[in-house]
């Protein structure tokens, strides 16, 4: 497999090295991240169906709604930092089903919640207890089932663990990649015991980290390197010019090739895909610049590839349920927007109740969102926006 990938990378280098401005007749997209693209405006509702789910609020169900997973029937949330141990299960109408808290020092408990993966078919929650280098598995009632220990050199605290198939989780080791502990950052781990099932190797010559550090502090772009794509997975390794697609049968192929080569840039500019639809590929470029005193940086450019027009644009997307032109972040919104690209859902995003109450009072909402906001107050749980693929 490693030999095949290396040969593929060489072929891609030869192809992209003599690239013109026109998209080639290949199975992968080529993106010049230094180009000045024409502007394009899109209306979210023109290409996705949007549903709003107000979360039930009562004494038991009060949450900041950090979104962890969504299934056909359930929404899984935790509070913002995951330190209080609360896990909230809502149904797809927003009605609270169960609140679970198994925090503690016992062998069947967790000390923190880095993230949660849902296997809805088996009725299992995988709690990323990363301080202890383990996943703890519970049923949907919070009953302990098993513990999956993983190597202490791994660190999945970025929360990028997902349900890959019936037997495995797919994980991204962000800290290990940042510290250059190993060549690969993408792994399949067994749902039964946490053992390594497969190391997903991507070819590159030198490790290039998107992180910057100064005086013991580190900063990174926090875009998503592991993205679902309707059963397959998009893998972003910052050290290589090729973004790959990884399938359920473990085959791997080029998905996007960026130019110019990452090794030729200073500072580096990285490319991250995000929401993927039948027509549009949303992407974002992020420059490796950060001011540690002002805590600002990583300037971004929002792009979209329109497959129908076979062209790339700089893009802004508006939510038509707001009277004013209100942009929707389709690319990066850490802790607020969660990319799904699976099971008919493109993404989910939380809308804070106090912001909706204010917008409602100013007459800035319309349609179903306006109706929901009329029944909210500033202490109400957030509203979950679910953007679904059109049937």
Could you tell me what each predicted segment is?
Residues 112-113, 130-183, 198-211:
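Asp-box/WD-like beta-propeller blade repeats and closely related beta-sheet repeat scaffolds
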């Amino acid at each position: 497999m490693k030999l095949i990938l290396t040969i593929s990378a060489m072929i891609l280098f030869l192809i992209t090295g003599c690239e013109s401005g026109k998209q080639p007749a290949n199975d992968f997209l080529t993106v010049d991240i230094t180009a000045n693209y024409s502007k394009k405006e899109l209306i979210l509702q023109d290409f996705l169906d949007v549903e709003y789910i107000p979360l039930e609020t009562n004494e038991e169900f009060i949450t900041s709604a950090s979104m962890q997973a969504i299934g056909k029937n359930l929404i899984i949330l935790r509070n913002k930092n995951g330190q209080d141990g609360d896990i909230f299960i809502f149904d797809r109408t927003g009605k609270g089903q169960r609140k679970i808290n198994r925090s503690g020092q016992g062998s069947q408990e967790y000390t923190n919640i880095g993230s949660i993966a849902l296997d809805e078919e088996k009725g299992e929650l995988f709690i990323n207890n990363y301080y202890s280098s383990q996943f703890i598995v519970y049923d949907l009632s919070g009953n302990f089932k098993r513990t999956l220990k993983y190597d202490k050199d791994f660190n999945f605290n970025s929360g990028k663990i997902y349900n890959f198939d019936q037997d495995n989780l797919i994980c991204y080791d962000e800290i290990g990649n940042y510290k250059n502990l190993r060549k690969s950052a993408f792994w399949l781990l067994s749902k039964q015991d946490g053992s390594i099932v497969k190391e997903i190797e991507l070819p590159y010559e030198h490790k290039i980290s998107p992180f910057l550090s100064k005086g013991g502090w580190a900063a990174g772009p926090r875009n998503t390197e592991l993205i679902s794509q309707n059963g397959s997975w998009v893998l972003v390794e910052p050290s290589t010019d090729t973004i790959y697609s990884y399938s359920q049968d473990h085959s791997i192929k080029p998905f996007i090739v960026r130019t110019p080569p990452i090794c030729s840039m200073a500072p580096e500019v990285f490319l991250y895909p995000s929401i993927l639809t039948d027509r549009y590929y949303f992407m974002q470029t992020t420059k490796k610049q950060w001011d540690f005193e002002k805590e600002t940086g990583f300037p971004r450019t929002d792009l979209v590839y329109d497959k129908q027009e076979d062209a790339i644009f700089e893009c802004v997307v508006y939510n038509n349920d707001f009277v004013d032109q209100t942009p929707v972040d389709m690319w990066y919104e850490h802790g607020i927007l969660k990319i799904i690209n699976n099971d008919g859902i493109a993404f989910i995003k939380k809308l804070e109740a106090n912001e909706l109450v204010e917008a409602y009072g100013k007459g800035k909402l319309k349609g179903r969102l306006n109706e929901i906001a009329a029944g909210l107050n500033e202490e109400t749980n957030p509203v979950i926006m679910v953007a679904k693929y059109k049937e």
